[in-house]
Amino acid sequence: GELRRHFNNDPGLILHNPIDESTHGFTDGIYGPLKIMQKAEVDFLMVHIPMGMFLLPQAISEVTSLKVLVKDVVRMHREGSMPMAVVISHTILPDTRVAVIERQETLAAAGLPVFNSVSGAARAIDRFIKWHEGRAEV
């Protein structure tokens, strides 16, 4: 529905699960898609920001893009009700590394769980869901 219409159909994009927003958001942010996902049939949202892997136009810095994305994630977390986790894959570039640490602190201060890898986030989400399922059975 509405979520699928937002995403283009470029070759290589995964349009089911997970949703690939890699060709958007670097200057405009990702608030719009996050807001749509809050209404869609999505149970849990993991936002992955792969530092050092962005294919950005030359005029856009990776640090600027990171700030825009984190701002939108924090805004959606405050306004929405869906459980969210954020993964910021690390980079070895000194300037970017400092920005990553600062944004991780911003996300944690907003109450969002922050992970360094998708696998670490997936394990934590799995445990979170199993814990809640166990509580529901009691």
Locations of regions flagged by a protein language model:
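Short glycine-cluster motifs
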Residues: 1-61
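Peripheral docking tails and interdomain loops at the edges
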Residues: 61-138
